[in-house]
Amino acid sequence: MWPFAPVPAGAKCRLVETLPENMDFRSDHLTTFECFNEIITLAKKYIYIASFCCNPLSTTRGALIFDKLKEASEKGIKIIVLLDERGKRNLGELQSHCPDINFITVNIDKKNNVGLLLGCFWVSDDERCYVGNASFTGGSIHTIKTLGVYSDYPPLATDLRRRFDTFKAFNSAKNSWLNLCSAACCLPVSTAYHIKNPIGGVFFTDSPEHLLGYSRDLDTDVVIDKLKSAKTSIDIEHLAIVPTTRVDGNSYYWPDIYNSIIEAAINRGVKIRLLVGNWDKNDVYSMATARSLDALCVQNDLSVKVFTIQNNTKLLIVDDEYVHITSANFDGTHYQNHGFVSFNSIDKQLVSEAKKIFERDWVSSHSKSLKI
């Protein structure tokens, strides 16, 4: 890439989806399987993966991706997979299956032991990257609805790799003081692009606050700012909205995102559509929160639907001008404690494509009224 070449619109980002085979529609976008396969096929030096857990062998397509990684590692490509300390259940089996892949467990909060690595992203050769809500599991690759973004624009990939370096510094095998030293080294160069300096209309946001580093944007700040500035419409497709934070088994009220949604509907007359998931991974407060939003805003233009098939898509669109794709629920525990990276864009084409996905999901036979 020439150093003074113009930045392509949308930083060459393409939307990526996993759609279960039992859905009544298909995607026009790259599949997660195709995305991961392309990253592996084109890799020449390294592939770095961050995921809460690693269970690719649970489906046939997941196993195919893992076999491709194994082949790449045997050819000398450096492969590192970051897992959360509490997501390593299948680690022994995977290590025995492929000893050339370096699996590293991380603990981003050794002091309080409440934070998890929640981020889902891949980076290869500082040239290609994926970020979204597909973890490195067979389900995310094949049987659970997910949404992410793939780019082969090197500056964006390099910026995401800096996040990988940050999470890697919290290797759970290291002593705490080594974690702090490693983090201190990588945080000052933590990002090149942010809300005030997007590249091609694209930037990343981060969580939690203690991992921000120099010039990174806190994800919750950006999300709440966008909700509070919404003028016409807010479309949300999420597994859950939970206005609480859990610490040591106790729940504490965390209304920041919840209140911003209510204020937009009641105070400013913003049209809001909320599509929530309804499956066994839901927080106990999730459906109660959805019903409370529906009840509080009964005199306003707020609609709530439930998606009946396993849906881990986490998507926010504001005023048809901004799109946010993340791996975190709108959940106080996630935003206060967990480590993740979110994708943000104001590029018109990317926002339009994300909007079409939301519209498709909203009117599909899998979306049911909350009142039914």
From Swiss-Prot:
A Pfam family it matches: PLDc_3
InterPro entries (alphabetical): Diverse_PLD-related, PLDc_3, PLipase_D/transphosphatidylase
Lipidation (S-palmitoyl cysteine): C185, C186
Entry-linked Gene3D superfamilies: Endonuclease Chain A
SMART domains per record: PLDc
Catalytic activity: a 1,2-diacyl-sn-glycero-3-phosphocholine + H2O = a 1,2-diacyl-sn-glycero-3-phosphate + choline + H(+)
Localization per Swiss-Prot or TrEMBL: Virion membrane; Host Golgi apparatus, Host trans-Golgi network; Host endoplasmic reticulum membrane
PLD phosphodiesterase domain sequence ranges: 307-334
Assembly: Interacts with protein OPG190.
Protein name per Swiss-Prot or TrEMBL: Envelope phospholipase OPG057
Organism field: Vaccinia virus (strain IHD-J)
